Curated annotation (Swiss-Prot):
CC annotations in GO: cytosolic large ribosomal subunit
Function (record text): This is one of the proteins that bind and probably mediate the attachment of the 5S RNA into the large ribosomal subunit, where it forms part of the central protuberance.
Protein name, UniProt field: Large ribosomal subunit protein uL18
GO biological process, one term: translation
Organism domain of life: Bacteria
Keyword rRNA-binding: yes
CDD domains: Ribosomal_L18_L5e
Keyword line: Ribonucleoprotein, Ribosomal protein, RNA-binding, rRNA-binding
Similarity remark: Belongs to the universal ribosomal protein uL18 family.
Lineage: Bacteria, Pseudomonadati, Campylobacterota, Epsilonproteobacteria, Campylobacterales
Keyword RNA-binding set for record: yes
UniProt-listed SUPFAM superfamilies: Translational machinery components
């Protein structure tokens, strides 16, 4: 189990990565930013138009009954790719939100690519 100081440092490092990544990414209506969030139990994603500061579409793994596993992330990626195509989006910018590109974050991105979304 981690103590409070270690948890604080872990979150601070993730926040620094998040700012470093987000400063280089910008999404618009034609190529939105796909931002992901993973909790210990669930996985979420949304497509964001940074120019209008609005969410184009989103997917909620908790409401759909998917857990935070690689298999479920692949299924969510396929469903999210369909939602993006319905909105007329073929290209996107992937924002891993400070998480390492590994595990469910990588599986979700690969699933988007396999289903026709250029990242």
């Amino acid at each position: 189990m981690m103590n409070a100081k270690a948890l604080y440092k872990k979150k601070a490092l993730r926040d620094r990565r998040k700012l470093r990544i987000k400063s280089k990414l910008l999404g618009d209506a034609l190529r939105p930013r796909v931002s992901v969030f993973r909790s210990n139990r669930y996985f979420y994603a949304q497509a964001i138009d940074d120019v209008k500061q609005s969410t184009i579409t989103h997917i909620d793994g908790r409401k759909m009954g998917f857990k935070n596993t690689q298999e479920d992330a692949k299924k969510l990626g396929a469903l999210f790719a369909e939602e993006l195509k319905k909105a007329g989006i073929e290209r996107a910018v992937y924002d891993r939100n400070g998480y390492l590109y590994h595990g469910v974050v990588a599986a979700f991105a690969e699933s988007l690519r396999e289903n026709g979304i250029a990242l």
